[in-house]
Amino acid sequence: MLQNPQEKSQAYPRRRRPGCYAYRQNPEAIAAAAMYTFLPDNFSPAKPKPSKDLKPLLGSAVLGLLLVLAAVVAWCYYSVSLRKAERLRAELLDLKAGGFSIRNQKGEQVFRLAFRSGALDLDSCSRDGALLGCSLTADGLPLHFFIQTVRPKDTVMCYRVRWEEAAPGRAVEHAMFLGDAAAHWYGGAEMRTQHWPIRLDGQQEPQPFVTSDVYSSDAAFGGILERYWLSSRAAAIKVNDSVPFHLGWNSTERSLRLQARYHDTPYKPPAGRAAAPELSYRVCVGSDVTSIHKYMVRRYFNKPSRVPAPEAFRDPIWSTWALYGRAVDQDKVLRFAQQIRLHHFNSSHLEIDDMYTPAYGDFDFDEVKFPNASDMFRRLRDAGFRVTLWVHPFVNYNSSRFGEGVERELFVREPTGRLPALVRWWNGIGAVLDFTHPKARDWFQGHLRRLRSRYSVASFKFDAGEVSYLPRDFSTYRPLPDPSVWSRRYTEMALPFFSLAEVRVGYQSQNISCFFRLVDRDSVWGYDLGLRSLIPAVLTVSMLGYPFILPDMVGGNAVPQRTAGGDVPERELYIRWLEVAAFMPAMQFSIPPWRYDAEVVAIAQKFAALRASLVAPLLLELAGEVTDTGDPIVRPLWWIAPGDETAHRIDSQFLIGDTLLVAPVLEPGKQERDVYLPAGKWRSYKGELFDKTPVLLTDYPVDLDEIAYFTWAS
């Protein structure tokens, strides 16, 4: 280290300076000194140069000062950023101007969402305990936005999110990303082309998320739907009931488009409120997909309070629809019942479908087609049959009941409320009963009770009920901000007849203790309303909280232009279909097995017997548990293996409870299939024990008269 220059000079011998005493001793020196006091006026003494050793030290000092200042500034900025980041974090949720993401306890991102209708001004955000709120968009527009954190249990963290526009007319849209290929999502709605897990195709602009008939139209969503989606990464989202909810998707970025709007839509703002849309939802994250689903079902869905009749689980339903269509009459019904018994099937449940009345909207039998309906019912009862009738919410203009409905104001009306609104449905033009009106409800149920009393009708098949059959603009006795509530009111008509009733719409209707029927199927193999769509549809409806499911008729509707194989379903398709149906909560025939040959009849008898001995007891046991747990009867494989990535993808196998695994053949010309067994000990229907699992059994042999099933053997 360099020393001070003065200190360095002190190391040399000191010279004695000539002081006054010296001058006094030497006159010559005094004279010389006097001579040097006279200097020129412009004389400038030489400036002392700083030492070369001093320059590095000065540079270091300046640099050090700058570094200190930079460190202070950086620390201040970091402190502000840290406080801001802390302000914009809600537990495991990180809020950005353009959206937010959520991590699980392991730090893995399990949910990501983007704000598509605007960004947040983060400087307008503040937190108050568990509530994080923002008051401005990045464009300076006012809004009401908050995220509230709730921990309902140790293993579950939930976030209540709400974005409400301050001004009417705008739409609010958020994009929920489905994640990478390893993330799988389930739920939403019954669809025309049904996949499990959800598979996005192309682009879909947001459409009203309301009940629709996907069989008769190209509507985006089916008759059973809920605002609920579930991820294999243990995240779930439930959109609030108050939202004017529209749903679209973008397959390129793998996102669902969640939108709230009041323009160009059947949704209406609540009375007295401006049409300022609100998009609000709850996102919950748990430890695994099964446990978070159980939490969401218990928290947000109703449960059935009762269980349908045991015979509905045990015995097949025999419907006249696909066999006779609208040409049904008394002789055909009696002949059908006779053939059922002649081929040694149980006298179980016979359903008289469309059309047995003089006109649509009447509530009695057409005396031409059914000259002695009372005698027909007596003979069917004596043979051991329980008989149900097809009903619907329409009253056609040529019905004897139409004038009464107009006079008593029983129908859904046009927007002014002065006239009934007429609609076109698959059987003509008519009015629609307004089930928000107590008078219409009493009138409809009164007619059903009279039918039951007069003919000893066991119950009813409640067809239609989708919002897509209401006019675009309408009014009801009680205003409907959410039009799907009309569908729910219709399902409530089944409550007095629940034991053998079936409905085909479901929206917040999990408490209706009857069977929910999937929309009609075509007699084809594929995912577009065909056999391959059956298991994905049943699993989807199960996840939406509907445990009692009727997967429509064996073989499909057999509509000529929508049938593979002619006027009846292909023989092989029919056999494979009845094998799957035998393991579903309910089983229904219309095209009877004797329309083919003796072998098909024998296979149908075999599976009807297997259902009665093996499947029905388990179904009834699980049905009894539903009223307490809300757990589905038909379950995906991941239900017992939530961490198994392979189980998340399988759409051609299912569980009944936790102990019976079913793997049907769903492709033409196949008598083998790959079967995936999750971890555990499984015994096949052939007696084989598989204890080294999980395992994929490739090309497992399954004959035409078989279905592969395995029971839990531990």
Curated annotation (Swiss-Prot):
Protein name: Myogenesis-regulating glycosidase
Record's function text: Putative glycosidase. Promotes myogenesis by activating AKT signaling through the maturation and secretion of IGF2.
Subunit-structure text: Interacts with IGF2; this interaction is required for IGF2 secretion.
Known outcome of mutating G64E: In IBGC7; uncertain significance
A biological process from GO: carbohydrate metabolic process
Disease linked to the protein: Basal ganglia calcification, idiopathic, 7, autosomal recessive: A form of basal ganglia calcification, a genetically heterogeneous condition characterized by symmetric calcification in the basal ganglia and other brain regions. Affected individuals can either be asymptomatic or show a wide spectrum of neuropsychiatric symptoms, including parkinsonism, dystonia, tremor, ataxia, dementia, psychosis, seizures, and chronic headache. Serum levels of calcium, phosphate, alkaline phosphatase and parathyroid hormone are normal.
SUPFAM superfamilies associated with the record: (Trans)glycosidases, Glycosyl hydrolase domain
Transmembrane portions of the chain: 57-77
Segments in the Cytoplasmic topological domain: 1-56
Domain of life: Eukaryota
Location of this chain's protein in the cell: Nucleus membrane; Endoplasmic reticulum membrane
Extracellular side: 78-714
InterPro entries: Alpha-glycosidase_related (IPR050985), Glyco_hydro_31_C (IPR048395), Glyco_hydro_31_TIM (IPR000322), Glyco_hydro_b (IPR013780), Glycoside_hydrolase_SF (IPR017853)
